[in-house]
């Protein structure tokens, strides 16, 4: 499995004319922790499964020899690019990360480290589970209702049945990023649901314990 994953990364990097050994991936743990990457830890292989990136769900860099990677199987992945300061970020935002506003944490980190202006930052939302399939019970619904009182709750939380709710975590991220200063037109959502398209994209909800992982990768030329 590890060999296949490494080959998949290598094939992807070759396809986009980037160097596989430049890849860095955090050990995602549904946190709001975002780390800056200035240099590689390994010399001749990617920086995967390193203690330096434990409990980390977002990475930022302004180095052209570093590729930032994240993986998902329903969770939201967001890629950020500041064309003015030449800085990028790659973020894993599952429902727990969304509750902790890791996307906003990332913007603030780019502002602090690189002097980014939020109005310049472009964000791409990758394929992920959508409201049509993100079904939760009362305990999780309450967490979202309490955290996002500043948003229009009727647009992001929909009651499906007596004990089930549908939550639009993509819209939540779009809204909180706009509140953080990103322009609406700079938030680009692919509009693809991983559950609806599980024949093309890995989905934990569909594949269960045999689930695979999709990846998002971004680098500066």
What are these regions (language model features)?
Residues 1-221:
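Active-site microenvironment for binding and transforming phosphate-containing groups
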